Amino acid sequence: MCIRDRRNAILEPKNLATRKCSEMTLNALTKQNHNLIGGSADLAGSNNTKTKHQKIIKPGDFSGDYIHYGVREHGMSGIMNGIALYGNLIPYGGTFLIFSDYCKPSIRLSALMQKRVIYVMTHDSIGLGEDGPTHQPIEQLSGLRSIPNLNVFRPADRVETIECWEHALKSSKTPSILSLTRQGLNPIRKSFTNINKCSLGAYEVLRTNNKINLTIFASGSEVNLAIETSHKLAKDKIYCKVISMPSMEPVSYTHLRAHETDSYLVCRLLLE
């Protein structure tokens, strides 16, 4: 499924929010995998976590595969841990990234217990949102990345979103965070490969010249900004290499070193 969807995403490039990309991926996944139990903390329409194939679990009818948890992120996260502990089921639940603080105790337990729980966190920046600074995450990503045995993914387009979901589902002993945008993003992947590049942690998406003056590392929505900035700098003969870094987990360290070989005189910038 994932390889076919990646190929289709490259052949049909569109400006999409990664929350929408996640919904498209989930539509394909829930059609095939009936062990996925979805849900949201009263934000299903904003998180794009419910698919057309899913049936809501209701009082007196537990045959469904989607839970409306209500406005209670902490309760949702604890219930997802319980579902994962039961076995043979993969729970995922959605909220805004700013509300990950309410989920934090259960996220830590997911990591400690080595359970495959997937947290879909949307509206992941100050880029777009009608609710103002109370709903704009700033320090949350750093806090989540500091938790051992937790995948934190911030994809930059539809292809990366598919790859992050693929990696999260294969991480049988590690919970995952998918940090997703509300605003639309231009596609960054132009050519198809069977390799899941997001599993590498970091990889090159643009090089404006063989002689590089600046390497820009970016994730999520800022990859688009890094690419746009690189093209503008090239007009002033300042040449850049852009590295998409959807994950900062240890698996990426080796690949990060590979991007340090151009020259020790090359400046490096982390944009997020």
Regions found by a protein language model. Give the residues of each.
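Short glycine/threonine-rich loop-to-helix capping motif typified by GTGT followed
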Residues: T49-K55, R108-L109, K190-F192, V251-R257
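Short, well-ordered alpha-helices that flank and scaffold nucleotide-derived cofactor binding pockets
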Residues: L85, H231, K235, C267
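Thiamine diphosphate
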Residues: R4-S179, G184
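Hydrophobic alpha-helical segments, chiefly the membrane-spanning helices
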Residues: V266-E272
